[in-house]
Structures are given as C-alpha cells and as structure tokens.
C-alpha cells in the first residue's frame, strides 16, 4: 500500500516508475493556469485547486485503482486575462501542440494507457475537448474532469 506522496510520478526515480506503473495504471494530470483571480488570490489558484483535488483522488483511490499523479501543467489558455500583470497564456496552436506532445511522451515513456485530466481552468475546456479526441489515436483512454462544470448549478 502506497501513500499519496509515493504515487506522485515526479517524486520517484525512473527505476521506481519502471517497477510500479503498469499498462492498466491510470495517470492523473492536473491542469491549471497562471492568471488573475481578483486582487486577493494568487495567480496560481487554478493550479493549486487542480493539484489538490488530484492529490485527494490519488490518496483516496490510488491503491484500489492504481492511480499515479503527474506534475501539474501550470499554463493554459488565459488570453482574456492578458491585461493583468503576471498572466501567462499559450496560443491555441501552442496549447494544442503541447497537449499532443504530452500524450505522445506519456505513450513513449510509460506503459500506462489510461489518462485522467483534472482541469482547474475553464479556459482550457474547449481545447481539451478537441485535442483529447485526437490523443485517443495515440492509444490513450482519456477522461477529463472539468472542475468548473462540477461547480455549475
């Protein structure tokens, strides 16, 4: 039985990953953004929320379903907040290419073919829906959890 911290891919040596991650494992990828959230919250709010929820999911169901947490993707599509100092945003074409590259690298470097994306930023939703369909062609089974959709009434 592993704790949540030991199921964080970025904290393991390559030899540990090689011996632990299997074809049936589920890789959990938190995604956020670096953008304004008003004068009172940090720019990385979406990252913190997505990473914390992913950590809780892995802590709760990691052993039972062989879940592994990947490092957070901190930059997304945030052009609507470009006016605010500190906002980092990719273009649609760069974000799409970045997501495809992540998918290809996961397939190249790990045996797991199951990916859960935990998206903490509403601006990423459209591009994720489009590109994850393409990423299935890489042999990945992908589910995306959009936190904003969960909080809608």
Indicate where each model-derived feature is located.
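Soluble secreted/lumenal catalytic domains
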Residues: 3, 20-21, 39, 62, ...
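Soluble or luminal CAZymes and related metallo-dependent hydrolases
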Residues: 9, 49, 94-98
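Short coil-to-beta-strand
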Residues: 21-31, 65-77
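A short glycine/serine-rich beta->alpha loop
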Residues: 37-43, 84
């Amino acid at each position: 039985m592993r704790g949540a911290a030991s199921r964080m891919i970025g904290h393991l040596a390559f030899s540990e990953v090689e011996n632990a991650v299997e074809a049936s494992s589920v890789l959990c990828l938190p995604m956020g953004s670096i953008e304004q959230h008003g004068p009172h919250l940090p720019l990385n709010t979406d990252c913190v929320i997505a990473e914390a929820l992913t950590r809780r999911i892995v802590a709760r169901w990691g052993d039972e379903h062989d879940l592994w947490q990947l490092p957070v993707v901190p930059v997304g599509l945030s052009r609507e907040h470009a006016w605010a100092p500190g906002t980092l945003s990719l273009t649609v074409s760069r974000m799409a290419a970045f997501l495809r590259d992540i998918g290809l690298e996961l397939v190249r470097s790990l045996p797991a073919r199951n990916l859960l994306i935990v998206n903490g930023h509403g601006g990423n939703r459209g591009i994720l829906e489009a590109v994850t369909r393409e990423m299935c062609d890489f042999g990945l089974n992908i589910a995306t959890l959009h936190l904003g959709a969960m909080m809608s009434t």
